[in-house]
């Protein structure tokens, strides 16, 4: 959790880093009393590893510029508390208006979440004024397409109407296979959609096969098997051919020989003012939703000048939260239900400029600039090309056809900037049958098998709910890829195109489950909170909070000695000698009885008290924290994790700060969340050299502004 901080002797919370620091407390939509479902892999460790790679890249960039090394402090806890998978935006929600997110029942949101179909399950999201009318026509309910009862937030639609629509939806789904339902939803309703696939489905899918997503590697002990090939593709500095896993001690002599050689001499640059690693790098940002903006947030945090290019003639999807503005009363009603995935407003008040006040957007908009231009028009493209000529990097994560129609592909921009680095982050890549499929992280994770493997072993996919770990990982890996491309350009003068398919980027995280299929032909199935060799390995209920809310602790026992210590702390030492639980093998064979026995005992304890008692005995455990508990975490407070930041519209709010520390590169949030068009004058006049007359023409044609054009934002009468 980071050195020298208030939680001493903490063994890694092996399966619940995402619970103690992140959003596991919200996962799983089963009936009250059922444990949360963890991610389907050791996600916190992998995500922390990706953060470590990015942090190392930042340190290398600094070293190459100054000759000075650095010390990097990464806390797995911090990486989860700051993750885009709901933890960071939900903490911003809480700062804005006190929302405490809650778990909710499966199927409770209209046209969203996992549903059964003819040959399995799909996850389709078709809510909102952009998609819902087309969705209703698609499922045979055209008479409801303009129904005013559906203009309220999805969670406030009358239950009778929801049930009526869901019945038609069910009938439609049961006449279609997974592939058919996803394809028709994508093509007819432009819905966000993905199948919930098994490892077998994934490995056999022609989309990934055609894109070269698998790599056959031979090993002397396991033979040839297919592995995930690469998280992203770099056109000018491709990843070397993967090598097999080494045998134990295979390279000892080679490493010792290299270690005996003198280190290369490095010339330190003259001492000067403190600089962040990416100072002087200009990044043009055409990103939407979460993964892309998160990538550019990380780059901006470490010094890059990130300029968002945003239209005022239309609302970008799921970005500034302005597709449809709710009233203050509607916001408060949704907040009282613990539901605010799309963000909320300070004190629930949308104000005059709700697009600047959305907590979801603002949680990743710090340290950035904003200019406005409609790049789908000739004038807007001309301005965009002029900006690109001054830039180092362009980042986008749109549906590929959107970028192609706007004529801002890498090939079309090269004449304006031959050394440009362009990062493209589509859901499923720039080629293949799924190229133009629309998806959020949760739909991508369904398509690649993560939703399947993280489900409850005895349950159904709708019960495990939605997670957005793909967005978080995509943002981190995208920033890392850009950092590597910048190093390559510094050495060679060569820019390049980086293609980061968010689906393929996640495949290495599922390596264990994928290799179980490719090596053994074994489907691991939904794993819930189970572990192959550890028991107990579960989230257990503890004493409810003072206001009656559920409270949970994750416990991970690897050895019989740890189990004995657990039993003593729980006041039931006799359990350790019970024949059903005396050995790990016995506990794994009697999991239901074990979980029932341990859960009955943990209910008597406060989760924080039990956490500290178990840690003091060497038992890996961690409380599943709510948003308010993370805000008041003495550990995060001691590490200076939260920062109080101002913005003219949303005021002073608390946000998660940077989540690793470099000893010789101190870093804080330097600028509050950027407002729409806030930097138009600077970008157009100073950077691009527009004259007063040129600038006036763009203003008159509706490109330049700080509010959306008349009629673009849909407001209810009383908003």
Residue ranges of predicted features:
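Terminal low-complexity tails and localization/encapsulation signals of metabolic enzymes
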Residues: 109, 116-117, 197-282, 525, ...
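Nucleotide donor/acceptor-binding cores
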Residues: 70, 279-281, 496, 551
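N-terminal helix-loop segment corresponding to the beta1-alpha1 unit
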Residues: 1-65, 179, 247, 251-491, ...
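Oxidoreductase and adenylate-handling cofactor-binding alpha/beta cores
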Residues: 25-27, 31, 49-70, 86-95, ...
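Glycine-rich beta-alpha junction loops
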Residues: 1-2, 76-81, 119-121, 127-131, ...
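A short glycine-threonine-serine/GTX helix/turn-capping micro-motif
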Residues: 36-47, 102-103, 110-112, 121-123, ...
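Conserved Rossmann-fold dehydrogenase catalytic segment
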Residues: 3-5, 33-42, 64-80, 102-105, ...
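Aromatic-enriched alpha-helical interface/lid elements that frame and gate functional surfaces
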Residues: 110-189, 206, 536-617, 621
């Amino acid at each position: 959790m980071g050195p020298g901080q208030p939680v001493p002797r903490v063994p890694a919370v092996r399966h619940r880093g995402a619970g103690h620091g992140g959003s596991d407390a919200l996962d799983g939509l089963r009936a009250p009393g059922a444990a949360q479902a963890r991610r389907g892999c050791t996600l916190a460790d992998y995500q922390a590893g990706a953060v470590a790679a990015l942090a190392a890249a930042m340190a290398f960039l600094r070293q190459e510029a100054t000759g000075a090394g650095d010390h990097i402090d990464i806390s797995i806890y911090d990486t989860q508390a700051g993750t885009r998978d709901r933890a960071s935006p939900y903490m911003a929600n809480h700062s804005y208006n006190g929302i405490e997110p809650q778990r909710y029942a499966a199927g409770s949101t209209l046209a969203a979440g996992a549903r059964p179909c003819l040959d399995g399950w799909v996850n389709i999201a078709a809510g909102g004024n952009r998609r819902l009318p087309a969705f209703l026509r698609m499922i045979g309910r055209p008479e409801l397409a303009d129904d005013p009862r559906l203009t309220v937030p999805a969670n406030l639609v009358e239950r009778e109407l929801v049930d009526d629509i869901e019945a038609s939806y069910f009938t439609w789904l049961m006449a279609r296979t997974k592939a058919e339902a996803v394809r028709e939803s994508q093509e007819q309703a432009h819905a966000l959609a993905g199948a919930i696939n098994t490892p077998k489905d994934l490995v056999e899918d022609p989309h990934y096969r055609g894109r070269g997503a698998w790599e056959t590697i031979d090993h002397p002990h396991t033979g040839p098997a297919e592995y995930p090939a690469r998280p992203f593709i770099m056109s000018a500095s491709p990843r070397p051919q993967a090598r097999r896993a080494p045998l134990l001690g295979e390279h000892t002599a080679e490493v010792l020989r290299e270690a005996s050689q003198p280190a290369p001499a490095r010339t330190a640059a003259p001492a000067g003012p403190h600089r962040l690693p990416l100072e002087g790098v200009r990044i043009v940002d055409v990103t939407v939703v979460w993964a892309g903006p998160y990538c550019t947030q990380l780059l901006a945090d470490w010094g890059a000048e990130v300029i968002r290019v945003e239209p005022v003639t239309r609302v970008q999807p799921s970005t500034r939260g302005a597709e449809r503005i709710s009233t203050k009363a509607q916001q408060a009603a949704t907040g009282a239900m613990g539901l605010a995935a799309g963000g909320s407003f300070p004190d629930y008040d949308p104000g005059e400029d709700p697009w600047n006040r959305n907590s979801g957007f603002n949680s990743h908009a710090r340290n950035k600039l904003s200019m406005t231009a409609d790049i789908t028009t000739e004038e807007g493209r001309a301005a965009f090309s002029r900006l690109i000529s001054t830039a180092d990097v362009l980042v986008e994560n749109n549906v590929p056809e959107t970028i192609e129609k706007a004529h801002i592909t890498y090939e079309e921009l090269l004449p304006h900037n031959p050394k440009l680095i362009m990062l493209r982050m589509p859901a499923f890549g720039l080629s293949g049958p799924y190229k133009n499929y629309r998806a959020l992280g949760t739909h991508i994770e369904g398509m690649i098998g993560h939703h399947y493997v993280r489900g409850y072993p005895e349950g159904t996919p709708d019960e495990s709910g939605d997670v957005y770990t793909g967005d978080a990982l995509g943002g981190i890996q995208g920033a890392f890829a850009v950092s590597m491309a910048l190093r390559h350009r510094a050495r060679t003068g060569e820019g390049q195109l980086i293609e980061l398919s968010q689906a393929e980027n996640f495949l290495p995280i599922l390596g264990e489950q994928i290799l179980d299929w490719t090596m053994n032909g074994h489907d691991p199935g939904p794993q819930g909170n189970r572990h192959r060799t550890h028991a107990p390995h579960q989230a257990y209920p503890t004493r409810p909070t003072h206001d009656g809310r559920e409270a949970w602790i994750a416990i991970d026992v690897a050895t019989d000695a740890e189990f004995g210590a657990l039993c003593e702390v729980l006041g039931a030492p006799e359990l350790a000698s019970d024949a059903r639980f005396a050995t790990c093998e016995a506990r794994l064979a009697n999991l239901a009885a074990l979980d029932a026995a341990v859960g009955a005992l943990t209910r008597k304890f406060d989760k924080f008290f039990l956490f500290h008692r178990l840690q003091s005995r060497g038992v890996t455990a961690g409380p599943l924290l709510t948003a308010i508990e993370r805000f008041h975490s003495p550990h995060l407070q001691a590490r200076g994790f939260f920062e109080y930041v101002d913005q003219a519209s949303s005021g002073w709010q608390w946000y998660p700060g940077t989540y690793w520390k470099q000893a010789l590169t101190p870093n804080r949030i330097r600028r509050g969340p950027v407002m729409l068009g806030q930097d138009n004058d600077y970008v157009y006049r100073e950077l691009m050299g527009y004259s007063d007359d040129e600038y006036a023409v763009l203003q008159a044609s509706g490109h330049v502004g700080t509010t959306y054009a008349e009629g673009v934002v849909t407001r209810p009468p009383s908003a």
